[in-house]
Amino acid sequence: MMLFFSSLSDWFPGVSVFRYITFRTVAAMLTSGLIVFLFGPSIIASLKLRQGKGQPIRADGPQTHFKKAGTPTMGGLMILTGIVVSAFLWCNLSNIYFWVSLFVMLSFGMIGFYDDYLKVTKQTEKGFSGKARLSLEFLIAIIAAFVLLQVGSSGLALPFVKDYFINLSWFFLPFSAFVIVGTGNAVNLTDGLDGLAIVPVMVAALSFALIAYLSGNINFADYLQIHYVSGTGELAVLLGAVVGAGLGFLWFNAPPAAIFMGDTGSLALGGLLGIVAVATKHEIVLALIGGLFVLEGFSVVIQVGYFKLKKKRVFLMAPIHHHFEKKGWTESQVVIRFWIISIVLALVGLSTLKLR
């Protein structure tokens, strides 16, 4: 649709606004949000009917979680539908970065969907084999990184440093795959409480929409002395759709949640954030902006690793949001405080664009 309206600009001057990334980003945000908001109730009703008992609740989890039994999962289907429809309406479909990002998002979403499907149908906490799932994720990430390498550089930009890049050479592929897969699974681990994951995802998406826009604009990139990557500005439109869909989803995911995002949504959105960070050369900044996801992910790694070594636990329960629940925080306290942390970390991450 964007290209159609742009072609009319010679006859209708006002239509030229469709060429602007900023306008299309806002339009994509509104479109995806409206789609999720309008179609959400029917999707939730359909999923609830098909899933019966809904997502299994962890037996060792906080007692307050047992009242969530019967809540349907796979809410990521709502989010992805809103994003994809909006993106096809407002994005430049000839942009390679758009297609690579869409490939990662939908591929990770399919893996998450299969995982959710197994959990719901078998009523077990264990879904897709961990090794098989990670293998597929790394394969997808390597393919995406290889495509990016063909159209860009293998350089790694450092925050707070002007015009200095580390040439990763062949190591770019495994490094990029680690960023993409790591982000996808970190977001997945964060999604454990009503509304907990979607707001930090929106905060990170909005932050990277700005980064993508600046990195893809040669004038802004030169002024800020950040790596210029031609074409990445289009990712701002895609991320705008993510923010809008996230807002629409939050309407239904706010406590008490009518639906859970599930692996379908968390893996897809995390993978998307990872590939955007790689494309814009802001992988390290992602660790700052998405610091909450890093914290959640490392809490699990530390818990599992320490238990294998010492047969003891560092946290009362992992991921770390459950630790604070066990300490006596209410679910709302954990969620809102973690939201605050994600916003503060995003501001710190964005400050690296200027502090050089």
Swiss-Prot record:
The chain crosses the membrane at residues 25-45, 70-90, 93-113, 138-158, 164-184, 195-215, 235-255, 258-278, 284-304, 333-353. Signal peptide: none annotated. It is found in: Cell inner membrane. It catalyses: UDP-N-acetyl-alpha-D-muramoyl-L-alanyl-gamma-D-glutamyl-meso-2,6-diaminopimeloyl-D-alanyl-D-alanine + di-trans,octa-cis-undecaprenyl phosphate = di-trans,octa-cis-undecaprenyl diphospho-N-acetyl-alpha-D-muramoyl-L-alanyl-D-glutamyl-meso-2,6-diaminopimeloyl-D-alanyl-D-alanine + UMP. GO terms for cellular component: plasma membrane. The keyword Membrane applies. Its main location: membrane. Its cofactor is Mg(2+). Its EC number is 2.7.8.13. It is an enzyme of class 2 (transferase). Pathway: Cell wall biogenesis; peptidoglycan biosynthesis. Keywords: Cell cycle, Cell division, Cell inner membrane, Cell membrane, Cell shape, Cell wall biogenesis/degradation, Magnesium, Membrane, Metal-binding, Peptidoglycan synthesis, Transferase, Transmembrane, Transmembrane helix. GO terms for biological process: cell division; cell wall organization; peptidoglycan biosynthetic process; regulation of cell shape. Pfam families: Glycos_transf_4 (PF00953), MraY_sig1 (PF10555). Catalyzes the initial step of the lipid cycle reactions in the biosynthesis of the cell wall peptidoglycan: transfers peptidoglycan precursor phospho-MurNAc-pentapeptide from UDP-MurNAc-pentapeptide onto the lipid carrier undecaprenyl phosphate, yielding undecaprenyl-pyrophosphoryl-MurNAc-pentapeptide, known as lipid I. Belongs to the glycosyltransferase 4 family. MraY subfamily. This is Phospho-N-acetylmuramoyl-pentapeptide-transferase. It comes from Bartonella quintana (strain Toulouse). The gene is mraY.
